[in-house]
Swiss-Prot record:
It is found in: Cytoplasm. Coiled coil: none annotated. Has three domains with a flexible linker between the domains II and III and assumes an 'L' shape. Domain III is highly mobile and contacts RuvB. One of its GO terms (biological process) is DNA repair. This is Holliday junction branch migration complex subunit RuvA. The lineage of its organism: Bacteria, Pseudomonadati, Pseudomonadota, Alphaproteobacteria, Hyphomicrobiales. One of its GO terms (molecular function) is four-way junction DNA binding.
Length: 204
């Protein structure tokens, strides 16, 4: 089973990328959001892979993060959601926004994804609501680490993000604002300072 691909981009199609790994090219089907974040032909590429084996067919699905891959599998645990719909949802909502939508039972946000009607959207937010908080927290942490590196002070940052979401901002907005605030405040800043700077970022 293939878990990750590291190679160079050979071709990017409408719903897939062809990754050249030492002369062997793999087709990985991806969300539109993932494809938009990839580089150009010839550039390096790293994808987390979910391998599907169906009778005589082997299919690879590629993701920028392990979290996106986890969401891909979690979405398909809901009746009526297959790989195509799961990718459509992830094309419309990144993990942080998806977790937030489910936590808030926001069927409208989920139903924006192609192929997701009212009934499927209802099942998604209902059946996954108990799983969303954990995923949301992980999404924020991953996003902040990507912005700032691994040396992020977890507690003040998490408290600041939580405070901004309680004020009505989306998790992605809050995480991005606090990431910017951390760059201004520097390491060791407390949550109060991060909240104040984060609000300034959001007011711009």
């Amino acid at each position: 089973m293939i878990g990750k691909l590291k190679g160079t981009i050979d071709e990017i199609g409408e719903d897939y990328v062809l990754v050249d790994v030492h002369g062997v090219c793999y087709v990985a089907h991806c969300s539109a959001r993932t494809l938009s974040k990839l580089g150009s032909t010839g550039e390096a590429c790293v994808l987390f892979i979910e391998t599907y084996v169906r009778e005589d067919q082997l299919k690879l699905f590629g993701f920028m993060t392990a979290l996106e891959r986890e969401w891909f599998n979690l979405l398909q645990s809901v009746q009526g959601v297959g790989a195509k719909v799961a990718l459509a949802v992830l094309s419309t909502l990144p993990p942080g926004e998806l977790a937030n939508a489910i936590a808030l039972q926001d069927r409208t946000a989920v139903s924006r994804a192609p192929g997701v009607g009212p009934k499927v959207a209802m099942r998604l937010v209902t059946e996954l609501k108990n799983r969303a908080p954990a995923f949301a927290g992980e999404a924020i942490n991953i996003g902040l680490k990507q912005e700032l590196g691994e040396g992020v002070a977890a507690a003040p940052v998490a408290d600041a993000v939580s405070a901004l979401t309680n004020l009505g901002y989306s998790r992605d907005q809050a995480a991005n604002a606090i990431a910017a605030a951390m760059k201004t405040a520097g390491e060791g800043a407390d949550s109060a300072k991060l909240i104040r700077l984060g609000l300034k970022e959001l007011a711009r």
